[in-house]
Amino acid sequence: HHTGDDFNGIGGMNTDLGDPVFAITNSLVVYRGEPSPGWGNTLILAHRSAKGTIHQYMYSHLHESFADPGELISRGEKIGTVGTANLNYPAHLHLELKDSTGVWIGRGYVSKAAEHLNPNLDERIFPEHSPDSLYPAPLLVTKNIRLKKAREEIMMNNNFQ
């Protein structure tokens, strides 16, 4: 199983090198870096669905990335440009969707789909494929993280009293 979808320009090969990459949802940047030469520049954005599930969108093989961890990104905002993952591949965008709250890069091919999602088949991500489902505020992701930490602190304090 390929863990994502690869998007190429109309002309193929490197015709899309440097083309803009836009965020597909309102999101929070949770990772920016180069996990390995094969991935190249990578961004991971977290988004809370209308049903409350956190999904991650991984944009890889970028030539440039313009978003920093902790930054709030709006749908349609330019976050990078299409690249070649350090000349390892012809230029293209590798886009992965994950049903996960932890930042894990992993491999580009796996034996089971696991937490990787197919947006065309998974209505949990885009109910009825409505564009409105892409708009919940990314701040809800950080709010959930803060609430979880607060609950953990309360539990720790209650267990030691």
Regions found by a protein language model. Give the residues of each.
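Zn2+-dependent peptidoglycan hydrolase active-site motif and core
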Residues: D16-G18, F22-F66, A91-E96
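Serine endopeptidase catalytic core focused on the charge-relay Asp
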Residues: H1-D5, P37
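Active-site/pore-lining binding-face segments in mid-to-C-terminal subdomains
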Residues: V82-G102
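Acidic, glycine-rich catalytic/binding loops that coordinate metals and/or anionic ligands
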Residues: S65-E77, E96-Q161
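Bulky hydrophobic/aromatic "packing anchor" residues in well-ordered structure
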Residues: D6-F7, P136
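Short hydrophobic beta/alpha edge segments that flank linear recognition/processing sites
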Residues: T42-L45, S74-N88
